[in-house]
């Protein structure tokens, strides 16, 4: 077992500790069982970190198992995307990838065993009749007229289902449990249905497919899972989980434990609603950096370490709560503050001309990549007579709180000299286009000899050697903390969730930027090169997160 002092603790780990101490289990085997019908989101990241993290900490194993029992909605592309997400988060699964479809023969055998024991029957009620017979939370169900069909006839009917002799929706195999149970999941649930659909793993071998609640527990048993961990919406289903395990001849007896799912402010987690965002072109794709998918966070510049830290901070409980977005943003902000190299980018450029700087002079300034981490080394930043600075970093007049460039006031250019503004040019609309200044050539890396110290520092890029870039300022997709509660969540989409800047200027070192690798743009925030640039050679940077939480003030 790894160092227990650094392990997180929660009620699930307490259960595992007790199971190991008592000898109930001699090792730990968990699993992460996504359905390959879409992209994983940050809620899945929590489950990945929990299941794989437990296996790591207890020197156990965690299986990656695809719950692929619904072929009409599944795709091999999602299988590949999910594998990429798990690996990106820093985890490896035990052995080969598992598929529920690997067990279709065994699952069919278990269904036959239930029929032979008089615990399953083929039912010909249609969907509407099935709902009517099922009852409600306040009204018990009633038995299907097909419930007492003989074992022999049910075996023959199930064989006909398997052989494709019934059309879809005509019949289904149901477990015979208790139609008066207070738990709806025990009112003779469907465990097999007819589907003439091509399967991405088994092809056209099967035309009957098992339901999730039947497949899940038996797959756990076949794989020797010791602790089957899922979210609270499956709490009642645990009774069906246990019933199935008790009724058939399985090689092991797993147990299910539930924890609260992740609810995150300003975010939707419903796959159906996320699909609506994509289908209605409210976002560009499933990996649009405003989406809560793992692929979107990766594209936005989030790091695996920040996601794992987030999962650690929010913990594992049975209590439903909503996590503030600031918790997630703090995790990535802290990670990148410590590890991201610095660079300079001017998003709204105006020209700065140093009038006393020689026309033919060009310098290669050596600038640290990180102010407190010498191991990150240095880079060369070109400097000459003409630079670009941010338009908001200059005013003709300003109060004492404004610590940037003002006429007759001095500031330091980051990593370079102290300059003093003298005058400016404006266009016909009165917008400043060019600022003129003088520089003190003795101030490279040091303060003026007269003892004065500039009160401000601004960033800049060389006007002649800077690179053109597109910068996408991503923000929260919704304007309200709980968009799912809105009558129409389209009405609460943040119109400023994406602001695209096409005229940005960046320092030349960023020509070597790699997709998804984040930089701190000095005084701006954290940005990474997009991983889906349509035009070869173009520089498109996505904002990962700002330097500080601007929403904290908005919400006050």
UniProtKB/Swiss-Prot annotation:
Span(s) of short sequence motif 'HIGH' region: 34-44
UniProt superkingdom: Bacteria
Reactions performed catalytically: tRNA(Gln) + L-glutamine + ATP = L-glutaminyl-tRNA(Gln) + AMP + diphosphate
InterPro entries: aa-tRNA-synth_I_CS, Gln-tRNA-synth, Gln/Glu-tRNA_Ligase, Gln_tRNA_ligase_bac, Glu/Gln-tRNA-synth, Glu/Gln-tRNA-synth_Ib_cat-dom, Glu/Gln-tRNA-synth_Ib_codon-bd, Glu_tRNA_lig_a-bdl
UniProt cross-references to Gene3D superfamilies, sorted A to Z: Glutamyl-trna Synthetase, Domain 2 (1.10.1160.10), Glutamyl-tRNA Synthetase, Domain 3 (3.90.800.10), HUPs (3.40.50.620), Ribosomal Protein L25, Chain P (2.40.240.10)
Record: residues binding ATP: 35-37, 41-47, 231, 261-262, 269-271
Chain residues that bind L-glutamine: 67, 212
Motif ('KMSKS' region): 268-272
GO cellular component terms, A-Z: cytosol
Listed GO MF terms: ATP binding; glutamine-tRNA ligase activity
Enzyme class, UniProt record, top EC level: ligase
Keywords: Aminoacyl-tRNA synthetase, ATP-binding, Cytoplasm, Ligase, Nucleotide-binding, Protein biosynthesis
EC numbers: 6.1.1.18
Signal peptide range in chain numbering: none
Keyword Ligase tagged: yes
Compartments it resides in: Cytoplasm
Family assignment from sequence similarity: Belongs to the class-I aminoacyl-tRNA synthetase family.
Assembly: Monomer.
PANTHER family: GLUTAMATE--TRNA LIGASE (PTHR43097:SF5), GLUTAMINE-TRNA LIGASE (PTHR43097)
Name of the protein in question: Glutamine--tRNA ligase
Organism the protein comes from: Colwellia psychrerythraea (strain 34H / ATCC BAA-681)
Higher taxonomy: Bacteria, Pseudomonadati, Pseudomonadota, Gammaproteobacteria, Alteromonadales
Gene behind the chain: glnS
């Amino acid at each position: 077992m790894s160092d227990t002092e650094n392990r997180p603790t929660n009620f699930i780990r307490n259960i595992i500790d007790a199971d190991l101490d008592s000898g109930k289990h001699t090792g730990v085997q968990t699993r992460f069982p996504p359905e390959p019908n879409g992209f994983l989101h940050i809620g899945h990241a929590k489950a990945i970190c929990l299941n794989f993290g437990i296996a790591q900490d207890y020197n156990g194993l965690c299986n990656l198992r695809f719950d692929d029992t619904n072929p009409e909605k599944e795709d091999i592309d999602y299988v590949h995307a999910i594998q990429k997400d798990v690996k990106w988060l820093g985890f490896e699964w035990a052995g080969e990838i598992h598929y529920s479809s690997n067990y279709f023969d065994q699952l069919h055998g278990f269904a036959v065993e239930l029929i032979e024991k008089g615990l399953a029957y083929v039912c010909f009620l249609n969907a509407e009749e099935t709902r009517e017979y099922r009852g409600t939370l306040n009204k018990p169900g009633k038995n299907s007229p097909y419930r007492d069909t003989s074992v022999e006839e049910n075996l023959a009917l199930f064989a006909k289902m398997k052989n494709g002799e019934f059309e879809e929706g005509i019949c289904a195999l149901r477990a015979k449990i208790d139609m008066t149970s207070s738990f709806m999941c025990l009112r003779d649930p469907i465990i097999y249905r007819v589907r003439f659909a091509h399967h991405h793993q088994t092809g056209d071998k099967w035309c009957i497919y098992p339901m999730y609640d039947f497949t899940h527990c038996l797959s756990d048993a076949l794989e020797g899972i010791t602790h089957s961990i899922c979210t609270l919406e499956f709490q009642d289903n645990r009774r069906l989980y246990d019933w199935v395990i008790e009724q058939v001849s399985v090689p092991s007896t797993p147990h299910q434990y539930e924890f609260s799912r992740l609810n995150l402010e300003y975010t939707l987690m419903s796959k159906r609603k996320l699909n609506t965002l994509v289908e209605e072109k409210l976002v560009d794709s499933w990996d649009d950096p405003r989406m809560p998918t793992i692929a979107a966070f990766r594209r936005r510049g989030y790091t695996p370490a920040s996601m794992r830290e987030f999962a650690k901070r929010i913990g594992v409980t049975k209590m439903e709560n909503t996590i503030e977005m600031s918790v997630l943003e703090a995790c990535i902000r802290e990670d990148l503050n410590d590890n991201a190299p610095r660079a300079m980018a001017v998003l709204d450029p105006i020209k700065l001309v140093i009038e006393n700087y020689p026309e033919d002079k060009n310098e290669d300034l050596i600038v640290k990549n990180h102010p407190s981490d010498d191991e990150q080394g240095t880079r060369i930043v070109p400097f000459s007579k003409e630079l670009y600075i941010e338009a908001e970093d200059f005013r003709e007049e300003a109060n004492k709180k404004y610590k940037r460039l003002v006429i007759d006031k001095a500031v330091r250019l980051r990593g370079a000299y102290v300059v003093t503004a003298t005058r400016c040019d404006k266009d016909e609309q009165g917008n400043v286009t060019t600022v003129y200044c003088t520089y003190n050539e003795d101030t490279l890396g040091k303060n003026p000899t007269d003892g004065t110290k500039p009160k401000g520092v601004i960033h800049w890029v060389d006007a002649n050697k800077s690179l053109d870039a597109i910068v996408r300022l991503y923000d929260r997709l919704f304007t309200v903390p709980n968009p799912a509660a809105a009558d129409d969540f389209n009405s609460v989409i943040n119109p400023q969730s994406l602001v695209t800047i096409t005229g940005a200027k960046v320092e030349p070192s960023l020509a070597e930027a790699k997709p998804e690798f984040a930089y701190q743009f000095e005084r701006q925030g954290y940005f990474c090169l997009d991983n889906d640039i349509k035009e070869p050679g173009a520089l498109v940077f996505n904002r990962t997160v700002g330097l500080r939480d601007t929403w904290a003030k908005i919400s006050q």
